[in-house]
Regions:
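Switch/communication elements of ASCE P-loop NTPase nucleotide-binding domains
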Residues: 1-7, 16-27, 132-246
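General N-terminal leader/first-domain-start detector
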Residues: 5-6, 16, 42-43, 106-110
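Hydrophobic anchor at the beta1->P-loop junction of P-loop NTPases
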Residues: 10
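P-loop (Walker A) phosphate-binding loop of NTP-binding proteins
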Residues: 13
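ABC ATPase nucleotide-binding domain signature region
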Residues: 23-85
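Generic solvent-exposed, charged/amphipathic alpha-helical segments
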Residues: 26, 91-99, 103, 195, ...
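Extended helical coiled-coil dimerization/tether regions that scaffold
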Residues: 69-139, 146-176
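RecA-like P-loop NTPase motor core
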Residues: 203, 222-329
């Protein structure tokens, strides 16, 4: 908060507290009044717009499917979706964004009062499979599409300098946008595209609005870093004794931020300390996969020496229990 920068971009592994950080920052900027429900009060009073796991909690499936009930994604009453859907009518824009990142055949249908969403899949020849339950990844993409529509409108309104000239006063008190990991299930092409589009939105902001973006994806981080023309970054390290070090880095993030080097260092340290554990094999496999992808090999096992290939491949496959090339560690 004290840094007073337009954009702060943060990378951290899963499980290190990015979502907790978003919550703590929200409480710092706008402490919740006693008895107030999260994101349920008047939108005009908000100082921070945030996307995180807590945002996704506003959407939940109606699991009461007795009597052949149709699966619906319910939306808890809140000021953000009420404004973007009921007052601004952005449902078609949301549907278009969602289809862009998933499939043009997968269509969301809002109820007239915007309290529920159902989904259908177009199979061609005018055949439709109605009322399907989408995957968790598709659900996350849908929720991001809702947030994206709100973010576009927020930036557009605040770019109007004179508050009296804005079409709404709903965002006049807004100071921060906190975005936590909007990349849960995108392939690399769409991941890059989302990062480029988000960077473009951020750069289009001409007001005093400040942005904080956190992610566990090295690719998403690097694309944003480069698109936002960042010049300086900081590496926060935690030591075994509980101490911390914050080191300033300059230049290309690919030189300052090297996930594969961190994996290599972690594995080498475990070997040196004679403390190799099961998860180190998962790290090793992850390192092989990233190297194979960079060198253009279809299978990471092709990197292994011929006399060790079969043995090591079996060992790593057995210990990591995964054939996924994009596994998050």
């Amino acid at each position: 908060r004290a840094a007073n920068k337009k954009v702060q971009l943060i990378y951290a592994f899963n499980g290190t507290g990015k979502t907790r950080l978003s919550r703590e920052f929200k409480e710092l900027i706008a402490p919740k009044a006693e008895g107030e429900e999260a994101q349920a009060s008047d939108l005009a009073a908000k100082k921070i717009l945030y996307y995180s796991a807590f945002t996704e909690d506003l959407f939940y499936w109606d699991n009461d499917l007795g009597l052949d009930a149709e699966p619906k994604l319910r939306i808890q009453p809140n000021s953000f979706t009420k404004w973007v859907l009921e007052e601004q009518g952005k449902d078609q824009s949301i549907a278009a964004t969602f289809q862009h990142y998933t499939s043009e055949k997968l269509t969301p249908h809002f109820s007239p009062d915007f309290s529920t969403v159902s989904f259908s899949f177009e199979r061609g020849n005018n055949q439709q499979e109605p009322h399907i339950k989408i995957s968790k990844g598709e659900e996350s993409n849908f929720i991001w599409s809702v947030f994206n529509a709100l973010l576009e409108q927020l930036i557009s309104e605040l770019n109007i300098v004179e508050a009296d000239s804005r079409s709404t006063d709903a965002f006049n008190n807004m100071e921060y946008v906190f975005i936590d990991d909007p990349v849960s299930s995108l392939d690399e092409n769409h991941l890059i595209e989302l990062a480029v589009n988000l960077a473009g939105l951020i750069k289009s902001s001409q007001s005093d609005l400040k942005f904080i973006v956190t992610t566990h994806s090295p690719l998403f981080y690097n694309v944003l870093f480069n698109e936002l023309n960042s010049k300086v970054c900081y590496l926060l390290e935690r030591f075994d004794d509980g101490g911390f070090a914050l080191t300033e880095k300059h230049g290309d993030s690919n030189k300052s931020f090297s996930y594969h080097l961190h994996l290599k260092q972690t594995i080498e340290q475990a070997i040196a300390d004679n403390k190799v554990e099961r998860f180190h094999f998962t790290l090793l496999r992850n390192l092989y996969e990233k190297t194979a992808s960079f060198l253009g090999h279809p299978k990471w096992a092709e990197l292994l020496p011929d006399d060790k290939q079969l043995y090591l491949a079996r060992i790593i496959n057995f210990t990591s229990h995964s054939t996924l090339s994009n596994e998050a560690v």
